[in-house]
């Protein structure tokens, strides 16, 4: 449980760099439809500078694509994670190797997801245990700067296929909203 909490905390922590970069004075909600912008402006004005806060989801709300999946692929590509370094307690099923293909962590993760999402999601969070927050943030920063799809091979049944895994792409409209909220004294938390 401690590992899962740390992984969730890291997910929240690493998004702070994007928020801090987007907070500049008098941000306009240019990427929002006019009726929604008007409603948001009213809500922000009503709640400004009163110690209020707003909480948002991260994956596919604050940005497009999944952080954990792309971070797994990125850290495996960089050699920070590997099946050899995988703790024994996270080896839930045998790796599926052939003479032509040695299964990596992305393929292993996908096979766990084929079994059950309730298995693969906690698993991928626990894969990052053992890294300090500073180390993980460095890897997330590297992933966000990479800006290219990551290549990985995986099993689809018994066939090896190639995946193209996109790193997260922050939604401009959400970045504007976060900046405007913070400019008006409303703390923003992204989980």
Protein language model annotation of sequence segments:
Residues 1-9:
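Bacterial N-terminal signal peptides that target proteins for export
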Residues 8-18:
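Bacterial N-terminal signal peptides
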Residues 10-12, 23, 44:
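Generic low-complexity, intrinsically disordered sequence content enriched
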Residues 16, 20-27:
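Boundary at the C-terminal end of the N-terminal hydrophobic targeting segment
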Residues 26-191:
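Alpha-helical substrate-recognition element adjacent to the catalytic core
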């Amino acid at each position: 449980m401690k590992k899962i909490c740390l992984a969730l905390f890291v997910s929240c922590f690493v998004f702070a760099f994007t928020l801090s970069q987007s907070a500049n004075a008098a941000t306009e909600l240019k990427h929002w439809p006019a009726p929604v912008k008007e409603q948001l402006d009213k809500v922000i004005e009503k709640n400004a500078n009163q110690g209020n806060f707003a909480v948002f989801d991260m994956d596919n709300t604050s940005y497009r694509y999944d952080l954990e999946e792309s971070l797994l692929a990125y850290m495996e590509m960089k050699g920070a994670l590997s099946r050899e370094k995988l703790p024994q307690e996270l080896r839930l099923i045998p790796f599926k190797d052939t003479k032509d293909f040695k299964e990596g962590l992305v393929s292993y993760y996908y096979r766990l997801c084929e079994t059950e999402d309730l298995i693969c999601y906690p698993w991928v969070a626990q894969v990052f245990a053992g890294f300090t927050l500073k180390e993980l943030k460095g890897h997330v920063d590297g992933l966000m700067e990479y800006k290219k799809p990551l290549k990985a091979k995986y099993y689809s049944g018994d066939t090896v296929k190639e995946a193209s895994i996109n790193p997260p792409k922050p939604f401009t409209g959400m970045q504007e909203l976060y900046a405007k909220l913070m400019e008006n004294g409303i703390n923003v938390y992204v989980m």
